[in-house]
Swiss-Prot record:
This is Genetic interactor of prohibitins 3, mitochondrial. It is found in: Mitochondrion. May be involved in the mitochondrial lipid metabolism. Residues 1-24 form a transit peptide.
Length: 551
């Protein structure tokens, strides 16, 4: 439970963050203290070699320098810069070898980026300092920690990557906060003090965020939700600096050639690799101090995606700047018709969506990678398996995003999706989401299934942007009398993992629903109704039969 933050954690091992380590003694990317003696230990770096005037006359002469401190420095030297200028240059920030290999070459061992528990991370936060919860909007409800929100007196929740869900920046400061305040109030019983959304990439709502942050706020969230990227956007927008940066350097000491380099030295370490940040790092942004904490994991032993997904695919998925925001506005779709043989839709093998027979469906993907439709899951995995071990490129190689080991049906779990009407969004933790729309005249043809590699979490939700937009219209037209969030039905749900040989999935899903809600009788819905009658008829309001999500 998160409640240990203010008491047990600090009684057992109170380690308040200190900015006493000088900025040149810590890796500018991950924050680890640097050392140059033992390459096998964390924090190892090679000291940059000084340029010697008289011995080196051109930039080509210094390209013998092999480590990134020097390579990056060479790249940043502008044409016309003399060696004397470079010699007198303000010292640049340093990076450890682990981060250099990971950031610049995409070479890393996941064991060097181990998960941290919430208990470990929270030790860096003094008792009286405000926490800002950071979560990824495209992956809601994943990354939202109910325990943190209910244990903070002035809770602040910031959703990142809003441009991957919302069409316009105005929704981040108006429609979304109203919707989520009502959502947490009526569905979780929480009074969240402030809810905001931002887009670091498009610079949406940064001023609104900064004005709502208290001094000495700590950014807390899971790995790769965008904490460090958000910090960098604030630094760039408001000329922020790292704490402990040499304050004796004044503007008149910095020439134009050095200014760009100086600004770059202030930025937080950002990468598509989870757990890059290893130590709490502080920044001065405008008149406020803000701290970037390492990401924490609910399960420190969870399987890293690197074991499942090919490195180039994982890089596409994780790099926010590669996301095509045109999809949010235009929503291009692929049509798939369900068959008796189990026709399925996939993006790289990250999942296989299997619609029920005779259903006609549209899929809009918000995940990078080429989609493909296979005859069935078994055939798909056989095809992906044949991609490996061939001397010549396989014609379907570009559609395979999983490692060789995962081209095996036993590595997958069968998720059954509870009944829905119209459209839903299927969310994959740390990957993204797709929109699934059932088209044509409504009829219940059976339950949808999605086969997902073991270790990847999945849930469903009603389309988020539609909920926010329609809720806001209802809220304003009623002059704030009607909630912007529907109260009478669940809006998110877990899937139901079943045995591959289970035939009566509809009866099994009811059994599993009753089991899941055994200690939450008050949330049970429609259990006295005839389930077949509920799903056989189209309703004005989606009944969302057997929807349930455990926060």
């Amino acid at each position: 439970m998160f409640v240990v933050r203010r008491s047990i954690v600090f009684q057992q091992s109170r380690r308040q963050f200190s900015g006493s380590i000088a900025w040149l003694q810590a890796c500018s990317s991950c924050g680890i203290k640097l050392q140059s003696k033992n390459p096998a230990l964390i924090g190892y770096y090679t000291k940059p070699k000084p340029l010697e005037v008289g011995k080196v006359e051109t930039l080509e002469d210094v390209k013998y320098m092999l480590f990134s401190q020097d390579i990056q420095k060479i790249k940043e030297i502008e044409d016309g810069t003399t060696l004397e200028d470079e010699k007198n240059r303000i010292p640049h920030s340093l990076i450890c070898k682990r981060c250099s290999d990971a950031v610049h070459q995409n070479k890393y061992d996941v064991m060097d980026f181990k998960n941290c528990s919430l208990k470990e991370v929270i030790r860096s936060v003094p008792n009286d300092k405000p926490i800002v919860s950071i979560a990824s909007l495209p992956e809601f409800p994943f990354h939202v920690n109910k325990n943190i929100l209910e244990n903070e007196k002035e809770s602040v929740l910031v959703f990142t990557k809003a441009d991957q869900v919302l069409k316009t920046s105005s929704a981040t400061s108006t429609r979304l906060p109203i919707f989520f305040k009502d959502y947490f109030k009526y569905h979780l019983g929480l009074q969240v003090n402030k809810v905001l959304a931002v887009s670091s990439l498009k610079k949406w709502n940064l001023s609104g965020l900064l004005s709502n942050l208290r001094n000495n706020s700590y950014f807390l969230g899971n790995p790769n939700v965008g904490k460090s990227t958000l910090m960098n956007s604030l630094i760039q927008r408001y000329n922020g600096t790292k704490l402990d940066f040499n304050s004796n350097i004044s503007d008149d000491m910095v020439n134009d050639a050095q200014h760009k380099h100086l600004r770059k030295a202030q930025l937080a370490g950002v990468s598509h690799i989870p757990n890059l940040t290893r130590e709490c790092q502080g920044y001065q942004v405008d008149k406020k101090r803000i701290y970037d904490l390492p990401g924490y994991s609910e399960n420190v032993d969870e399987l890293p995606l690197e074991r499942i997904v090919k490195s180039n695919w994982l890089e596409w998925v994780r790099k926010t700047n590669l996301f095509d925001t045109k999809k949010v506005k235009k929503k291009p779709y692929i049509t798939i018709k369900g068959t008796e043989n189990g026709r399925c839709y996939t993006i790289g093998g990250l999942f296989f969506l299997q619609p029920p027979p005779y259903s006609i469906n549209q899929i809009i993907k918000f995940i990078p990678g080429e989609p493909y439709i296979f005859k069935n899951v078994t055939r798909a995995l056989e095809t992906f398996k044949s991609v490996y071990g061939n001397d010549t490129p396989h014609p379907l190689e570009k559609y395979c995003g999983i490692n060789d080991e995962y081209c095996d049906i036993t590595k997958y779990q069968r998720h059954v999706i509870p009944p829905f009407q119209g459209s839903i969004e299927i969310v994959f933790k740390d990957i993204g989401y797709i929109l699934l729309r059932s088209t044509g005249r409504y009829s219940f043809n059976g339950l949808y299934e999605i086969w997902v590699p073991k270790g990847i979490s999945v849930c469903i939700r009603e389309p988020l942007e539609k909920l926010i937009e329609e809720g806001y219209v209802q809220y304003t037209e009623s002059k704030n009398k009607i909630s912007s969030c529907p109260k009478g039905r669940p809006l998110v749900s877990s899937t139901y993992i079943m045995d591959p040989n289970e035939e009566d999935t509809f009866a099994k899903i009811r059994e599993m629903y009753l089991d899941r809600t055994e200690n939450e009788i008050s949330v049970r819905r429609l259990v006295k109704e005839d389930p077949l009658e509920v799903v056989s008829n189209k309703h004005d309001t989606p009944p969302n039969l057997y929807w349930h999500y455990k926060w």
